[in-house]
Regions:
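Hydrophobic alpha/beta core scaffold segments
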Residues: 1-378
Length: 378
């Protein structure tokens, strides 16, 4: 059985669809609108002895564009391992990274000998506030024993949602650790450009920026938007402006990491989609204008890794903020990516954070505003 999209959850029909996968491994990407169907999917997979891992996302993606409901059923060929882990909310980044390291080490112990380093694909609950720091600590432990990629699942409303599941459990505040073959290494692209002078995060912790250049962070962001658009930004408008003009972290190697503010505290602090360390160098970014340029670039990079054919599936995780920026042009970007890659089908989800490297072999980073994509035989 190849990948399969379902939008109806009739138990009899769904059981017949799943029957060819008896005894195999399956990933399910489930739209938030259908989150109540997890128990049915778990029961049917358990009845058929299908080893299940899954996650809930705001919406799904197909070659035709956004899919607001339904589920992607993605059979996984061997070798493939997936483990769902709860993470203690009180744990700091080093402690959580150690838990993940211990689990991944046990998975690597049974990975085929003499094969190239696999890809460690991490699916986090998006409400974990210190994912970037967890990645830093994880890299210190695992280094180049694996390649790194991943995504964030959860609610598009940024509200708590148990969004990760296996055959028995449905968890919030956890991570699914997956080992994929080396040839499934995903690539990442965002295309956001600098549009303002550098600033300093003079007060920040986890995913909250309190002060920028010693001024309340929201006030500073308001001033930047006023300069660009001659408009006084309100709290309610923040997220819809920020997907077009997010903040960026400037790294020492010249790379830029997107951080999208999505809420404001009563004190005027900005709550972002991921961490911003104190004393980070910030700038205002401008979202890409072209809905094709970066899709073409990503397709070229995929094709340089492997010769994609109509027998390949593109598995894509596309930032929900990027989708709000491009609107209807999201479909253009996805179709360009599929056609230029040469693959035959596209399946994926709107994500709430993307883990990967801008260049193959680079240190893993936690991104926003990005497309994460890989090609696999189906």
């Amino acid at each position: 059985m190849k990948q399969h999209y379902v939008c109806q959850f009739n138990p009899t029909e769904l059981a017949a669809t799943l029957a060819p996968l008896q005894g195999r491994k399956l990933t399910i990407l489930l739209a938030e609108q259908d989150c109540a169907q997890v128990a049915l999917l778990q029961q049917l997979c358990s009845d058929l002895e299908i080893t299940l891992d899954g996650a809930i996302f705001p919406q799904l993606l197909g070659a035709q564009g956004l899919l607001p409901q339904g589920a992607w059923l993605l059979p996984r060929p061997e070798p493939y391992q997936a483990t769902l882990m709860p993470l203690p909310p009180e744990g700091d980044a080093a402690q959580l990274a150690q838990l993940i390291t211990d689990q991944v080490a046990s998975m690597l112990a049974t990975w085929p000998a003499l094969s190239p380093p696999p890809t460690l694909f991490l699916t986090f609950d998006n409400l974990i506030p210190n994912i970037a720091s967890i990645l830093d600590a994880l890299y210190l432990q695992l280094a180049n024993r694996v390649n790194y990629a991943g995504t964030n699942a959860g609610s598009g409303h940024f509200t708590p949602l148990a969004c990760l599941f296996d055959n028995q459990r449905l968890l919030a505040y956890g991570v699914t650790c997956t080992l994929l073959p080396n040839n499934s290494f995903p690539f990442l692209e965002h295309g956001y450009q600098l549009s303002a002078q550098p600033m300093l995060a003079t007060g920040s912790g986890a995913n909250t920026i309190t002060y920028i250049d010693w001024q309340p962070a929201f006030h500073t962001y308001q001033e930047l938007i006023r300069q660009q658009f001659q408009h006084t930004l309100t709290h309610e408008e923040l997220y819809h402006f920020a997907v077009h003009m997010p903040l960026g972290l400037l790294l020492a190697n010249g790379d830029v990491i997107v951080r999208i503010p999505f809420d404001v505290t009563d004190e005027g602090a900005l709550i972002c989609s991921s961490e911003v360390s104190e004393h980070s160098i910030l700038t205002l970014l401008k979202a890409p204008e072209s809905a094709t340029d970066h899709a073409c670039s990503l397709a070229r990079r995929l094709c340089q890794q492997q010769a994609l054919t109509r027998a390949h599936l593109l598995e894509v995780y596309y930032c929900a903020g990027r989708q709000l920026h491009f609107g209807q042009q999201t479909v253009t970007e996805l179709r360009t990516l599929l056609s230029d890659s040469g693959a035959g089908e596209l399946a994926g989800a709107l994500s709430l954070g993307e883990i990967g490297s801008i260049r193959s072999g680079d240190y893993p980073q936690f991104h926003n505003g990005a497309i994460l994509c890989n090609g696999a035989l189906v």
